């Protein structure tokens, strides 16, 4: 909500910007084109009127930052999530670069006090050729900062996250787990963006 995808006219609609791989996967998995779709979502929560009392304009200057689940300091500086967003200039360290961005750049702004105009949640329902139905939910409100996939089939189901994929068959109890942990940390969605 605070980074490069915060405004549709400067980037893309958020579903395209953040879920294009998910939609590609669904199209590949079904092998079908979408016949009909409906979509609901809005920018309901990350607005100034919903900011907690005491929230500052920037996370580093915020009196309630340590209790905020959306703290940019915690996300980027402490946990080191999404640090590929920061271009480290020659002669600077990653810590220096992150702190400077948190002090002056778009990534240090309070999520409630940004100039964002994209939805903070969206639900997409699609009917594919062959009467296959698909739903996709893009949520900002989750403790899990990764994709989850659950595919229900007539003979089994597939569920996974960005590290593992588990395939279970209803008859016979056959279950297989595929582990992708060794590539999950690679940049550009483990190289998928480059192909």
What role is predicted for each listed range?
Residues 1-107:
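Predominantly a Rossmann-like dinucleotide-binding segment in NAD(P)-dependent oxidoreductases
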Residues 4, 9, 20-23, 107-112, ...:
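Residue-level detector of functional hotspots within protein domains
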Residues 8, 73, 79-80, 85, ...:
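Generic signature of intrinsically disordered, low-complexity segments enriched in small/polar residues
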Residues 10-16, 109-113, 183-190:
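Active-site rim elements
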Residues 14-18, 22-25, 34, 111-112, ...:
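Long, contiguous hydrophobic alpha-helical segments, chiefly transmembrane helices and signal peptides
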Residues 76-77, 107, 112, 141, ...:
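Sequence-level detector for tyrosine residue identity
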Residues 91-138:
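Alpha/beta-hydrolase fold catalytic core
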Residues 118-195:
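C-terminal helical cap and adjacent loop that interface with cofactors, partners, or active-site loops
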């Amino acid at each position: 909500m605070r980074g490069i995808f915060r405004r549709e006219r400067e980037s893309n609609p958020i579903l395209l910007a953040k879920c294009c791989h998910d939609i590609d996967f669904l199209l590949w998995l079904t092998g079908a084109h979408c016949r009909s779709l409906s979509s609901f979502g809005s920018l309901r929560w990350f607005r100034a009127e919903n900011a907690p009392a005491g929230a500052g304009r920037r996370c580093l200057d915020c009196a309630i930052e340590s209790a905020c689940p959306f703290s940019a300091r915690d996300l980027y500086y402490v946990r080191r999530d999404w640090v590929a967003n920061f271009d480290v200039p020659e002669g600077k360290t990653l810590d220096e670069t992150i702190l400077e961005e948190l002090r002056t750049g778009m990534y240090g702004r309070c999520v409630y006090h940004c100039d964002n105009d994209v939805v903070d949640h969206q639900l997409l329902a699609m009917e594919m050729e062959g009467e296959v139905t698909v739903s996709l939910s893009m949520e900002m409100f989750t403790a899990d900062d990764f994709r989850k996939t659950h595919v229900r089939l007539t003979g089994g189901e597939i569920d996974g996250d960005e590290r593992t994929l588990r395939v279970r068959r209803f008859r016979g109890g056959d279950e297989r787990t595929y582990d992708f942990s060794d590539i999950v940390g690679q940049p550009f969605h483990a190289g998928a963006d480059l192909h």
